[in-house]
Amino acid sequence: MNVTLLIPARYGSSRFPGKPLAPINGKPMIQHVYERASLAKGLTNIYVATDDERIKSAVEGFGGKVVMTSPDAASGTDRINDAINQLGLKDDDLVINLQGDQPLIDPTSIEQVISLFERHPGEFEMATLGYEIVNKAELDDPMHVKMVFDNDYYALYFSRARIPFGRDTKDYPVYKHLGVYAYTRRFVQAFAALPLGRLEDLEKLEQLRALEHGHKIKVAISAFDSIEVDTPEDIRKCEQRLAVD
């Protein structure tokens, strides 16, 4: 199975401009993401998908591969769709979408979503990752997206609010979403053509578009947390984690 991993990266960010190039222990964040991804087994190719020449230069500087995408991409999926069209992938080729703000992603987590497609061919259109929240401060932080899934590990909903809500107890597991997606080229194109969902627009969570239109998202539970970098403070958290790893 041909498996292409794409890392969408944009320079502009309202909370953290230039985030992909922010240094973490002397290397740009995008390099950490790329190098972590390259340790995952089963990948055919890895590319950074960007519309910014500064990011392109940085990636090529450490030996990475880049696909230049349109600056008009309205979402991460649109950027992924643009990239796979340029790469000429086949309809059944697997695409891994690894968010560019995941410098500490564990390679085995990437392998988990690949394995879901290998073990359950044709049973779902999309796969992603969850992690049981340990840090209680994340429970009510809208920057940490929560998720619920059924007994067969199919996603039921994603939210910036704490879900599920325990009416009579606070002692229960809550899972957060990790920014890794897997889908076929065929589904990426179909997904990009779907209209914006009402819930997607409310929560500002693109994956809800798939659920709103009746598509199935399979979930793998990772044993490893991954810090998502949204602010400069998160850079310091990454450096602290790397110091003890």
Swiss-Prot record:
Pathway annotation from the record: Bacterial outer membrane biogenesis; lipopolysaccharide biosynthesis
Catalytic activity: 8-amino-3,8-dideoxy-alpha-D-manno-octulosonate + CTP = CMP-8-amino-3,8-dideoxy-alpha-D-manno-oct-2-ulosonate + diphosphate
Subcellular location: Cytoplasm
Top-level EC class as recorded in UniProt: transferase
Main localization category: cytoplasm
GO cellular component, one term: cytosol
Glycoprotein among keywords: no
GO biological process, one term: lipopolysaccharide biosynthetic process
Hydrolase is among the record's keywords: no
Gene Ontology terms, MF aspect: 3-deoxy-manno-octulosonate cytidylyltransferase activity
Taxonomy, superkingdom: Bacteria
Alphabetically ordered keywords of this record: Cytoplasm, Lipopolysaccharide biosynthesis, Nucleotidyltransferase, Transferase
CDD domains per UniProt: CMP-KDO-Synthetase
Pfam families reported for this sequence: CTP_transf_3 (PF02348)
Enzyme Commission identifier(s): 2.7.7.90
Family, as annotated: Belongs to the KdsB family.
Protein purpose: Activates KDO8N (a required 8-carbon sugar) for incorporation into bacterial lipopolysaccharide in the Shewanella genus.
Protein name according to UniProt: 8-amino-3,8-dideoxy-manno-octulosonate cytidylyltransferase
Species, as recorded: Shewanella sp. (strain ANA-3)
